[in-house]
């Protein structure tokens, strides 16, 4: 399950993430789910408030060059997937 905590400081995060404007720019297309049971794999995210609940911690950055993962939020869960299957974080978030 991808239970995501957005950290306040970069050194607390497992990875830095930049939200990109277009799907074609993304390493990962992600979908935000409201239910824990639906937060499966790396691409379906449930945001949590506490570190103890999180399976993966991210720090949001402004520029693509600063990011470990370039991410694009999709509207439907079927669209959520890694666009770059060889990315070093594949299988590590959930």
How should each PLM-predicted stretch be described?
Residues 1-94:
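Repetitive, compositionally biased segments used for assembly/scaffolding
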């Amino acid at each position: 399950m991808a239970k995501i905590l957005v950290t306040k400081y970069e050194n607390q995060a497992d990875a830095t993430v930049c939200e990109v404007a277009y799907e074609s720019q993304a390493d990962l297309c992600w979908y935000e789910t409201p239910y824990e049971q639906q937060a499966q794999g790396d691409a379906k995210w449930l945001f949590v408030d506490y570190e103890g609940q999180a399976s993966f911690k991210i720090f949001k950055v402004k520029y693509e060059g600063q990011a470990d993962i370039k991410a694009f939020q999709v509207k439907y869960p079927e669209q959520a997937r890694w666009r770059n299957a060889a990315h070093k974080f594949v299988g590590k978030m959930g």
